């Protein structure tokens, strides 16, 4: 069977898996590590071609995280929000997503994905948003996420919040700090880390359509 579930589990499937795995394999020609140097070849291939879509998604995410990327950032890059024609998204976030879109194509489902590094636990829907994922937060600090309501019997008087995941939106819990991190707050923080807009305007060229 698959040796995965090191960083993710998911409900659904990754329909773009062939393109995702092929492009990751193509990138290996230009990959290098200043720390591992020649030993870096032992890391390759990034993706186990014999694995399932779950295993391949896990391979890619683990590779980014083990390379030094923060887990939520790696998830945002691999499973982005629908941003290109989003009229309510801030320009900073659009610039962020456009910047990373040149480096990583979306891993599209339909899939609901749960991820963790032991301290952070999160969930995200792919940008198509076709897998149901609902969650409750209770007054005694439980968070219950499932594909349907009624999976567990919960006293309705204890529920302080009920909501559902939306396409590309992230539910993230910091178990060390004991708090839920707001999606907008998290992503604006990442979007503020670099002047992505400047990089995009400097490196991207829009060709005329006529």
Each model region followed by its residue ranges:
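Conserved mixed alpha/beta core segments that line enzyme active sites in large multi-domain catalysts
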Residues: 1-23, 63, 68, 72-174, ...
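Short, small-residue-biased leader/transition segments that mark boundaries at the very start
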Residues: 3-4, 206-209
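Short, glycine/acidic-enriched loop or turn micro-motifs at the edges of active sites
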Residues: 14, 177, 209
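A detector of low-complexity, intrinsically disordered, Ser/Thr/Gly/Pro/Ala-rich segments
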Residues: 16, 204-207
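A short, polar/charged loop-to-alpha-helix boundary motif
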Residues: 23-37
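Intein/HINT protein-splicing elements and their conserved insertion hotspots or analogous self-processing inserts
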Residues: 37, 41-82, 159-205
């Amino acid at each position: 069977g698959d040796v995965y579930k090191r960083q993710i589990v998911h409900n659904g499937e990754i329909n773009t898996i062939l393109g995702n795995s092929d492009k990751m394999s193509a990138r290996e020609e230009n990959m290098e590590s200043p720390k591992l140097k020649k030993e870096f070849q032992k890391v390759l291939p990034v993706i186990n071609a014999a694995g399932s879509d779950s295993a391949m998604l896990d391979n890619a995410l683990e590779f980014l995280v083990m390379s030094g990327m923060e887990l939520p950032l790696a998830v945002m890059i691999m499973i982005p929000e629908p941003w290109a024609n989003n009229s309510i998204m801030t320009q900073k976030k659009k610039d962020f997503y456009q910047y990373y879109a040149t480096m990583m194509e979306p891993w599209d489902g339909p899939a609901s994905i749960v991820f963790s590094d032991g301290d952070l636990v999160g969930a995200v829907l792919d940008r198509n948003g076709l897998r149901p994922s609902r969650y409750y937060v209770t007054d005694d600090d439980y968070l219950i996420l499932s594909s349907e309501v009624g999976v567990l019997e919960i006293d309705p008087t204890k529920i302080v919040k009920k909501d559902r995941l939306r396409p590309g939106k992230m539910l993230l819990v910091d178990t060390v700090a004991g708090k839920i991190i707001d999606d907008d707050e998290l992503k604006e923080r990442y979007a503020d880390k670099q002047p992505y807009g400047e990089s995009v305007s400097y490196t991207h060229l829009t060709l005329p359509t006529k």
